[in-house]
Amino acid sequence: MKAESIEIENVLRPGKTYRANREKYEAMREALVGVLPRSVPGFSVEEMIAAVKPRLPDALFPGGETAGWWVKAVQLDLEAKGLVRREGKPLRFRLAA
């Protein structure tokens, strides 16, 4: 049986959507929203990856495999939807208020 897909956005490519595995997307979204702070300074990409790994189901992300790619994909999608904000340089990310 083929995995169900979901359309995701990329803040860097407005108007374009991409197909992604729904189950992995939803697991990563739940983990990412659960760890990202609302306040500045937020997390770096490396901090986001480290924070979500313990929250990911091993059946979908064995040993945290591919977590980095999925963190970035979900972060870009949530940013395009206005739910995540990027702050300063070096880049840091937080939940929108």
PLM regions: where:
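A short, conserved structural fragment
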Residues: 79-88
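Short, positively charged loop/turn segments that connect secondary-structure elements
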Residues: 53-71
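Short capping segments at the starts of secondary-structure elements
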Residues: 36-46
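A general alpha-helix detector
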Residues: 31-35, 51, 55
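A short acidic, leucine-rich amphipathic alpha-helix
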Residues: 44-53, 78
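Short, cationic-aromatic polyanion-contact patches
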Residues: 89-97
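Long, low-complexity, charged/polar intrinsically disordered regions in eukaryotic proteins
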Residues: 1-34
